[in-house]
Amino acid sequence: MGPLMLDVLGYELNAEEREIIQHPTVGGIIFFARNYHDRAQLRALTKDIRKTAAKPLLIAVDQEGGRVQRFREEFTQLPPARAFEQHNNGIELAKKGGWLMAAELLAMDIDLSLAPVLDLGFDCKAIGDRAFSDDPKKIIKYASQFIKGMKQAGMATTGKHFPGHGGVIADSHLETPFDSRENIKEHDMIVFKYLIENNLLDAMMPAHVVFDAYDDKPASGSDYWLKQVLRQDLHFKGVIFSDDLNMKGADVMGSYSERAIAAQQAGCDMVMLCNNREGAIQALDGLPQVNVPILDTLLKRPTGEYQELIKTSMWKETEKEISRLSLEWREKHS
């Protein structure tokens, strides 16, 4: 599988996208809200992508819940991660939420929801209620259950944003944040460390944040954070994704091809470049044509179709509980 994940523009593939998807460097497609009209359209799109690619290809989406849920109509409305902490039955509900999110996507032939968020909430604009808590010990508790639910459904898990995005107010979608704390390894990073030690993470996504007490590069392009800390010190054996290299937080890494190459050389197995077709093509031309076998470990196993899933008692009961939690959260925070 190739090392580049990119996006498509709409509900259907256009001629240029059909050609791009067949390029040997392309190993993944990530969906956004603009790619979704209804389940029938989405299913047709995933089928077309797999047929066109004629090779193993990861199909991913950000379907965390709350404000980061790309597919809404005809899917369960998922609560943000923070909702679990604020419910007295939140531990059990977190596992059910992880299962439901994953099961619905797998039934649509989507391999991955890039989840869960393992950052501390703090006041970070990019994170906020996407975090389970502001307390790392509580994040470990809730995230572990959410992950177990995802794995029960059959989906690989992606922890983000290593070693922790929550300590900066700036949004890395809009600018390059700097975090000067020296204690991040003893604070934010303990969440990632625990989950790695307990074999709960299949993939990792680093932050577009410069931790300047340690290195002058964003973690997503830093061999210090990816090779030394994540691989050597924490013994992480899974896949490393870059976050979207079109984000402003990656601007300090150079041109689009330079960003992709820098992220790959720093230790990313798959680099992501979205919402910029010209930039994606630059990355496509700049990256070496290599096969990355570890990416195959994230492909979904065969599952039933969505119509079969929603007939099961487990889906019906879980959907009712998670929908209720989501509604309660929205009413409380509207």
Curated annotation (Swiss-Prot):
The record marks D171 as: Important for catalytic activity. The keyword Signal does not apply. This is Beta-hexosaminidase. GO terms for biological process: carbohydrate metabolic process; cell division; cell wall organization; peptidoglycan biosynthetic process; peptidoglycan turnover; regulation of cell shape. Its EC number is 3.2.1.52. The active site is at H173, D243. It catalyses: Hydrolysis of terminal non-reducing N-acetyl-D-hexosamine residues in N-acetyl-beta-D-hexosaminides. GO terms for cellular component: cytoplasm. Pfam families: Glyco_hydro_3. The keyword Ligase does not apply. It comes from the Bacteria. The gene is nagZ. Belongs to the glycosyl hydrolase 3 family. NagZ subfamily. One of its GO terms (molecular function) is beta-N-acetylhexosaminidase activity. Signal peptide: none annotated. PANTHER family: BETA-HEXOSAMINIDASE, BETA-HEXOSAMINIDASE-RELATED. Gene3D superfamilies: Glycoside hydrolase, family 3, N-terminal domain. Substrate binds at D62, R70, R130, K160, H161. Keywords: Cell cycle, Cell division, Cell shape, Cell wall biogenesis/degradation, Cytoplasm, Glycosidase, Hydrolase, Peptidoglycan synthesis. It is found in: Cytoplasm.
